[in-house]
Regions:
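A ligand-binding cleft/hinge motif common to bilobed small-molecule-binding domains
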Residues: 37-44, 66, 72-95, 102-117
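Segments of small-molecule ligand-sensing domains
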Residues: 130-207
Length: 207
């Protein structure tokens, strides 16, 4: 989930408000930076439009925001992200998660069917009083096209029917569901995976 995190009182309520602000766009060369710059681009914003562009990882970005060294930062990660949780519970600090879900169609038009719109539910972070629409890209489990169909079927089945084991390792895995598993793929589904989804009555999006 793409997060755009701003400090309450910074004057940042929309992506357009990032112009002229100090923004961390993610570590150099990271997925966060690539996706974050594409979100900004969808709104007609380039790094030159920012007062300053810091290129920090999420922990460093969170620290810089708390220290008022930046006005906002971009982060792409699961829900909830520990560093964002930490800021949200810091005494005297209130954050805003900036909506930008309407960037997804523009990103798809330019870069292909890698992105879609999803929601960070209210209450994910302290102070979030409503759902926030954001642009997201999925993580993919990729197999060679020559993998045997029964094996691909069993892998898909085991993965999706044992998500509780994954959640025990990483809370972000709670977002993995039958419906979410078929969203945002830019490559064809393996026949073995398709057989499992068909058994479960899950339709594959046209994209």
């Amino acid at each position: 989930y793409m997060h755009i995190v701003a400090m309450e009182g910074s004057g940042i309520k929309t992506v357009a408000d990032l112009k002229g602000k100090r923004v961390s766009t993610g570590a150099p060369g990271s997925g966060t930076e690539v996706k974050g710059l594409r979100v900004l681009e969808a709104y007609g914003i380039t790094p030159k439009d920012l007062k300053s562009q810091d290129r920090l990882g999420v922990t460093e970005s969170a620290g810089a925001l708390k220290d008022r060294k930046i006005d906002a930062f971009i982060w792409d990660g699961g829900l909830p992200t520990a560093a964002v949780l930490d800021i949200a519970v810091t005494p005297g600090v209130k954050i805003n998660i900036i909506p930008h879900g309407d960037a997804a169609p523009k990103m798809v038009a330019k870069y292909g069917p890698l992105y879609f719109t999803a929601v960070i539910p209210k209450g994910t972070y302290l102070g979030m009083e409503s759902d926030v629409s954001v642009a997201v890209a999925t993580n993919l489990l990729v197999a060679h096209e020559r993998m045997e169909e029964p094996l691909a079927y069993q892998i898909t089945k085991l993965f999706l029917e044992h998500t509780a084991d994954l959640v025990a390792v990483h809370k972000g895995a709670k977002e993995i569901t039958l419906k979410s598993a078929v969203l945002g793929s830019s490559v064809p589904f393996h026949p073995g995976a398709l057989r499992y989804y068909k058994e479960k009555g899950i339709k594959i999006p046209a994209s």
